[in-house]
Amino acid sequence: MKEMPKAYDHQGVEEKLYEKWEKNGYFHAEPNPDKEPYTIVIPPPNITGQLHIGHAIDETLQDALIRYKRMSGYEALWLPGTDHASIATEVKIIEQMAKEGIDKRDIGREAFLKRAWDWKNEYGGRIVKQLRKLGASCDWDRERFTMDEGCSKAVTKVFVELYKKGLIYRGDRIINWCPHCKTALSDAEVEYEEQQSHLWHVRYDAPDKSYSITVATTRPETILGDTAIAVHPDDERYTGIVGKTVVIPVVGREIPIVADEYVEKEFGTGAVKITPAHDPNDFEVGVRCNLPVMRVFTDDGHINELGGRYEGLTTMECRKKLVEDIEAAGNLVKIEPYGHNVGTCYRCHSTVEPLVSKQWFVSMKPLAKPAIDVVRSGEIRFVPERFDKTYYNWMENIRDWCISRQLWWGHRIPAYYCDDCGETIVAETAPERCPKCGGKLHQDEDVLDTWFSSGMWPFSTLGWPEKTKELDYFYPTSTLVTGYDIIFFWVARMIVFGMEVMHQKPFSTVYIHGLVRDEQGRKMSKSLGNGVDPLEIIKQYGADSLRFSLVTGNGAGGDMRFGTKKVEAARNFCNKLYNAARFVLMNIGDAEVGDIDISRLDIADKWILNRLNTMIREITANMDSFDLNLAAQKIYDFVWTEFCDWYIELAKPRMNGTDEEQKANVRAILNRVLMDSLKLLHPFMPFITEELYLNLPNAEETIMRSAWPKAKAEWDYPEEAETMEEVMDLIRATRNIRAEMNVPPSRKLKMTLVTHGARAKALEASIPYIMKLAGAEHVAIQQDKHGIPENTVSAVAQAAEAFIPLSDLIDVDKERERLNKEAEKVKSDIARSSGKLNNQGFVAKAPEKVIAEERKKLAAAEDMLKKLEARLEQLNNM
């Protein structure tokens, strides 16, 4: 057996192993009638992106599940791909062209799209290469792109089919408009942020001034597009003037007073201005009351020709000037400070303007019902379950989805218009002439919302609309792993399309994880400068360390706080594991490792095998229930504490002994526990586990194709394991005395254990272990305290009370002096912390984090003082 290097080199190992894995096709999956399929489709990252910490947690969780299922005997497919990301990519290319002094309108659509494809080919694969650095075991042979030929064919077919069913239509409706990106946005693409503004109260007078109505608005610039004032039909204050008119201040245009139940008569004056072209609720009132629609904003956020003297001003310039003019006219009643949610573009964060525009829409109500039912029935479940409420809330209140975008990069809408008769033709292949009049046709200029194509991702990537063996075998997929921030954008739409197109659920489980935040709990962002580059972390600490820190810190659905200390702890774990494996392999040497002989097991062996069984059962259950953080933490605790700190130390005396049969059995146990531990750890730390596994005797060609561990009934020793835990508890108590009384490790203890019955017998069999790990030269067991010398300290453990004479081990007077000095220092610390916390000025002004730290320091100091005083009391009684 070749000797392992003294230290683990993650950089050399990771590059070497990944190349080998990919070359040997270990990630590849094929339809296999002898195996059950398990499929995950990757949430396709944008081609504009590069690996960030959000990707890292997302892909780590998916990879852990895939590796677990692969080892559990499934034909596990993790299907990768990238998203064309219409707006994000187009913005990038426009920015690049702007540096060259080029406008996209100057070069035309074809030349722009050539640039876009060139950009995609140059930069689009960057994030895929970075995913490999993370250890992602995707089936790269099946990599897809949302605008590749197959996906594009699926998109066109679905559009045409939905159009034929009347579920896609074109019409003038209120939409969300980004004046910066100059495109429509769906409701899900609008982010809301609290902004402090004002509420302007404006009076509208009757033409003859005989009556008036006051309304309040947060957007006075929309007054230019008002077409009515609405009141509630049951509001007696306005019964006499419904149907009459008022004059828009400054503008001078008469508008009617209408009655509509949308108005809350208890709110404000009970009257609202209606601007159907620039507010979604007003648009609905306008439809019910047959009001005209006056759009007064241009696509780039200026006032158009209907704005009269305000034409050409930006919306903000118009607001300022119009308010001044209304005040001058005497119609401004008052201005109040007002905080409200303002819609912003999810991509560029510009303020979104609601306005009426001719767009393409998907009628969502009929599509939403089966998508709701499939979750309610339990066919699709959310993990954690609470996120199904988020899903229901969105789906039950869903509005029609605006799917057209005024962009060039994306799936062009397959609609064609006749230049002569105006006929609209929607078809999968472009018709040459108008079927109605034979006239010339031109295609719709708009492209589809990116989420329209990614909503078909689970089945378009498997070959639909063709009937493929992959689609038949791997669909429906098994698990979707994603963040809670795209439940509306993506999850809901995949369920909608799955039920409508495939008449099947797209997946069985939606596993939701939270966001990765910084150590203060803040969202990571460029503006805060608190972002973390996963590639830098991988370079410094290794992919395994990053992956493990992300999994252990992330409970399902909850946000996690991330910092390099967690990665350092994971790196330390790698080193601990490596050193343990090196010890095991050095002790195995070239010896043959056979099966474990259960007839030769002692109590320590039975304990570790029992614990291994427990770990296998619990970790398997955790993986199946998506409690990946618990699974990772359990294997960490088992390997670090029970295997490395305890069993290896318990094994050393026997490995150094002369009983060859016993040594062979201990070698077999060490090998088996290490091998199964590596397998349990592999989904989270694929590189180091593979590197160590391949050094073990009887290893297969790769750990990822080896079988997931199974518990063995013959290794269940609950009683012996309980006894061993009591022995370990006793050793820990003795070590605490040694540490607290400052007894050097070189000084051997003489111990008397007071216990009786079966425990005495069990402890007697464990005396060699107690002597070795407690640092004792003599251990006696007796039934009572008779004959215990006075100059002893005691430690109470579950199995026994340990009495240790100290007079021969330490200078009692010096130790008493040392403890007194330490106690005085701790008292001083307590006084200082108490003083701060009792100071009202400190508590009022200090940050909560600082106050919490001070309370923590005080509690720790008080605990330490109790321990010191207890030890002093023992010394004083000697």
Regions found by a protein language model. Give the residues of each.
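Short Cys/His-rich metal-coordination motifs, predominantly Zn2+-binding knuckles/fingers
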Residues: 181, 251, 348, 419-421, ...
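N-terminal, positively charged nucleic-acid-binding surface of large information/translation enzymes
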Residues: 1-234, 258, 275-288, 292-307, ...
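Short acidic-hydrophobic surface loop/beta-edge motif
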Residues: 200-206, 244-249, 343-347, 416, ...
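Short glycine/proline-rich turn/loop motifs
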Residues: 41-47, 375-385, 470-477, 558-559, ...
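Feature 926 captures the class I aminoacyl-tRNA synthetase adenylation module centered on the KMSKS loop
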Residues: 201, 393-452, 456, 500-543, ...
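Active-site-adjacent bridging/hinge elements
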Residues: 34-42, 64, 101-103, 128-135, ...
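Catalytic cores of large soluble enzymes that bind and process phosphate-bearing ligands
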Residues: 5, 9, 13, 53-57, ...
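Structured ligand/cofactor/substrate-binding pocket environments in proteins
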Residues: 54-66, 82-83, 151-154, 212-327, ...
